[in-house]
A protein has these predicted regions:
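Histidine-centered active-site/metal-ligand motif
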Residues: 2
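Beta/alpha (TIM)-barrel catalytic core signal, keyed to glycine-rich beta->alpha loops juxtaposed to Asp/Glu
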Residues: 5, 10-179
Length: 179
C-alpha cells in the first residue's frame, strides 16, 4: 500500500494486499508512509492472514528523522520487516546544490516540491555545518548523508535519484563509510 489513506478502512486495504499476494499478482506485501498505529494494525493483520509485511517505506534523512523519533524503525525491526528510506538527500538539500543559495532551475527555484521559504538561514547554516563535517571526513555531503541513512542495519535500501552517471558513482561511494 503506497500511502496510508485515513478515509479507507485499514482492514479493507490490508485485505486487498492479502488478496493480491494470494492471487500471485504480487510476491510480497509492504506499506509506505503509514503512521505508527496504522502500521501496527497492518503488521498484525497481514501476519494473521499469512501474508507478512516485508517492508515499510518512509521519508528518512539527516534532516527528517521522524521514522526514528516516532518509533517506526524499531517497530519495523520488532515485526521482522525491512525499511526502505526515500528522500535520503532531502530533495537535494543534503548535497552541495544549495550551499551557495538557490540555483536557477533547482527544485527550490521552481518552488514545486521544495519551497524556497523552507530554506531558512538556520537550515542553510545547518547544511553548511554538515558539509564542513563531510569535508573533514573526506566525503561529499551527499555521501555522508547516504552513509548516515545506511548506518542502521534496519535500513535495507534507499531510494536515491541521480541526474548523471558521475553523481550516481559519487553516491555509491557512501557505502564505504557506513560502519
Amino acid at each position: 500500500s503506497h500511502r496510508y489513506d485515513p478515509h479507507t478502512p485499514l482492514e479493507e486495504t490490508m485485505q486487498a494486499l492479502v488478496d493480491i499476494v494470494r492471487s500471485g499478482k504480487a510476491l510480497y506485501a509492504g506499506i509506505s508512509n503509514y503512521p505508527y498505529e496504522a502500521a501496527a494494525f497492518a503488521y498484525n493483520y497481514l501476519l494473521e492472514h499469512d501474508t507478512p509485511c516485508l517492508l515499510h517505506q518512509l521519508k528518512y534523512n539527516m534532516l527528517h528523522r521522524n521514522p526514528e523519533n516516532e518509533g517506526l524503525l524499531a517497530q519495523a525491526r520488532e515485526n521482522g520487516s525491512g525499511f526502505i528510506a526515500f528522500s535520503p538527500l532531502a530533495q537535494g538539500l543534503l548535497t552541495d546544490r544549495y550551499l551557495n543559495g538557490v540555483p536557477e532551475g533547482s527544485r527550490a527555484a521552481r518552488n514545486f516540491t521544495l519551497k524556497q521559504d523552507c530554506l531558512t538561514p538556520e537550515l542553510l547554516e545547518k547544511i553548511g555545518r554538515l558539509n564542513r563535517l563531510a569535508d573533514e571526513r573526506g566525503q561529499t555531503l551527499a555521501q555522508m548523508a547516504l552513509a548516515w541513512v545506511l548506518r542502521d542495519s534496519m535500513v535495507t535500501s534507499v531510494i536515491v535519484g541521480a541526474s548523471s552517471v558521475e553523481q550516481l558513482d559519487s553516491n555509491l561511494q557512501s557505502i564505504r563509510n557506513t560502519g
